[in-house]
Amino acid sequence: MIGSTVGVEGAPREDHVRSGEAAGSEARFSAYVEGLSTALGHRDREGPFRAYCTGLLGTEGRKSVEPLAAATAPSRVSGQHQSLLHFVGQSEWSDAAVLAAVRAYVLPAIERGGPIEAWIIDDTTFPKQGRHSVGVARQYCGQLGKRANCQAAVTLSLANHHASLPVGYRLYLPKEWAEDEPRRKQAGVPDNVVFETKAAIALGLLEQALAQGLPRGVVLTDAGYGSDTAFREAVTALGLPYTKTR
């Protein structure tokens, strides 16, 4: 019997094919990370950035700094932990610049599958324990399908029938957080971050996308946004068509 790793005469062995695919994926990943790292401002941030991205893709379960450090540098977990913690929590780099670099890299590939058809406004939630993570509160958690302790972010993605790309996101800061000065200070919330409704955040993301000249599509929202008359009127005033899902 011919084993699975022995190919037809003249054809590549399956293990060789897999090895080549893995090498190609690693090369594309390296090129992608290197391209994005130019948006970080300093060359010395490329190493922690690469480790952070590698950990996010290769680590199961919790995506906090501790397991990422253990997965990406098992022989020097403590040092890697400090490096990643500094990169994530203290390094001053622009998320807007990184998002722009992502768009420049990914959007042309998506548009090869067809023109952008939709701008999708959605909530993304992250279940959390405790009360010290920024914005964590008891609220509806989509991941769990019920009210629970979680963080929530408003996101904007461009999409066609081929793929989608997140182009904007903003953490929702509940009023109880926005008005709690000691809690804000302890968590490092910037002074210019104030309470905004999710609808107001979504409108800000739409205005930002228009200012960036991104290819337009129909604004898609769930009923939580679509039932807000002021939100619908504001979207119309921006010159954007919209529809809502149930």
What is each PLM-predicted segment?
Residues G3, E9-L220, G224-R246:
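Conserved, well-structured functional cores that handle cations and Mg-NTP chemistry
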